[in-house]
Amino acid sequence: MAELGEADEAELQRLVAAEQQKAQFTAQVHHFMELCWDKCVEKPGNRLDSRTENCLSSCVDRFIDTTLAITSRFAQIVQRGGQ
């Protein structure tokens, strides 16, 4: 097998990083689903009632807001460290 050139290796690393990000995002979504499901759904049925739908929506929104706040704060810390 031929060795990869620098450009090919960089592209491969970029693709691997993108796949890792997708996997991390998927894992995070499943984690949110599990936590919010356990918090909001008392007994599964054919349909979700409005209270359960609102609870699930609010739960996911809280996790997204928290994740964005933490990410933003971390970026600020990293940026200050690089100055």
From Swiss-Prot:
Cystine pairs: C36-C59, C40-C55
Signal peptide limits: none
GO CC entries: mitochondrial inner membrane
Matches recorded under InterPro entries: Tim10-like (IPR004217), Tim10-like_dom_sf (IPR035427)
Topology in membrane: Peripheral membrane protein
Chief localisation class: mitochondrion
GO molecular function: metal ion binding
Compartments reported by the entry: Mitochondrion inner membrane
Pfam families linked to this entry: zf-Tim10_DDP
Subunit structure: Heterohexamer; possibly composed of 3 copies of TIMM8B and 3 copies of TIMM13, named soluble 70 kDa complex. Associates with the TIM22 complex, whose core is composed of TIMM22.
Entry function: Probable mitochondrial intermembrane chaperone that participates in the import and insertion of some multi-pass transmembrane proteins into the mitochondrial inner membrane. Also required for the transfer of beta-barrel precursors from the TOM complex to the sorting and assembly machinery (SAM complex) of the outer membrane. Acts as a chaperone-like protein that protects the hydrophobic precursors from aggregation and guide them through the mitochondrial intermembrane space.
Domain notes for this protein: The twin CX3C motif contains 4 conserved Cys residues that form 2 disulfide bonds in the mitochondrial intermembrane space. However, during the transit of TIMM8B from cytoplasm into mitochondrion, the Cys residues probably coordinate zinc, thereby preventing folding and allowing its transfer across mitochondrial outer membrane.
Name this polypeptide is given: Mitochondrial import inner membrane translocase subunit Tim8 B
Organism from which the protein derives: Bos taurus (Bovine)
